[in-house]
Structure formats: structure tokens, C-alpha cells
Amino acid sequence: MNNKLIPLSREFFARDTNIVSQELLGKVLYFQGKTAIITETESYIGQDDPACHAARGRTKRTDIMFGPAGFSYVYLIYGMYYCLNFVTETDGFPAATLIRGAYIISTKDLYTADTSKVGSQISGETARRILIREHRRIPKFDVPNLEVSKVDGPGKLCKYLGINISHNKIDLINNNEFFVSDINLKLPYSTTTRIGITKGIDKLWRYVVTNPIDLTKISF
């Protein structure tokens, strides 16, 4: 784990799901050496939300959604794509935030022990020259194995990071390899209806970062 990244507290997740979904934008998702800045989220809240997996009650699959907050909820869709969610709200109330998109900004090499050769370069002039723009992949820089890409869609995100069903029910709080961290990055976002569903389509529970992210303002 990069020593500058500190996992969010359980209290962060144990709140109103829409607040959590909004405040996750701009947060860093760290997974086994890969780092991403979250840019799109959706809320799924309670048994009264027809699009929520818990709408039909507590099952073996949805048990994790009933708490405690701050755990991962990973499931398979269409028999081929994994989706990553973070459990929210208080114990006993089923809710989660779906992570729909992110900017992947580094590979495992950036978090090696030898920060004098890698990490320090990212926080110096190299990082100041890197801009992440909408719908653009920038594959080569003068830092070894650095990749920058925008990932749209929860299935693509999990595929790129390597997240699968084995990463379901993971505690994101007491973890060095899978967690979310705050780097004080505030990003403008728009609010829309959720997509890819057939029920509860009227709810404005999708949050999407509206502007490109400028790495000149990021330090971690």
C-alpha cells in the first residue's frame, strides 16, 4: 500500500447512500497495486427500491447488503461481467453504491518499495505534465509501466482492475490491498437517472463527473 493513502472509515460508508455515492466521486480506489479515481456512481437503496437486489428480501446473495457498511459487494451479470459495489447505511438496512466508472491512473510498479525511482517521479514534474481527458487513453510516459485510461461501465472497471467474485464481502476498512481513500479532490458532477435497469428508472440516483481530471492538482 502507498503510505500516503489511508482507507476511509466505516462511518463514511454508514450514511445515506446518495451522500456516499456523491462523495465517492474523486476518491481513490486502490486495488492490489492499481489505483483509480472514481468518476461515476449509482445508488441502490432498500427493499422499496425495485432496482435494488434486496427488493425481494434477504437472500444468500444479498445478505452482505444488510451490513455492516464498508464491505464490498461483487456480483456477476449476464454470466460474464462483474460489478463492484460498496455497502452503505446502517446495519440491517440493505443499500449499496455501484461503482460505474473511473480513471485508472497507475499500475503496481508505482507502489514498489523503491519510491526514489518511481513514486517521487509521479509527485514531481511528470505528474504535473499528465492530463487525463475524457474518452482518451494515454499509454506512454517517462515513468515505467504507467497507464492512464478512462473506464466507463462497471463490468469494464472490474475487468481492468481484476476484480471478480472472490473479492465479494471484503472489508474495505481494515485492508491494505483493497480500499478507498480521500485525496481531497472535489469534482463537479451531474445527477441523472440510473441506467441499465428496467425498474426504478425515475430515480435520480446516478452521479457522473462532468469535467476531465487534471493530475496537476493531484498528489498522492
UniProtKB/Swiss-Prot annotation:
The keyword Cell membrane does not apply. Disulfide bonds: none annotated. One of its GO terms (molecular function) is alkylbase DNA N-glycosylase activity. Its EC number is 3.2.2.-. Transmembrane segments: none annotated. GO terms for biological process: base-excision repair. Keywords: DNA damage, DNA repair, Hydrolase. SUPFAM superfamilies: FMT C-terminal domain-like (SSF50486). The keyword Cell membrane does not apply. Belongs to the DNA glycosylase MPG family. This is Putative 3-methyladenine DNA glycosylase. It comes from Rickettsia bellii (strain OSU 85-389).
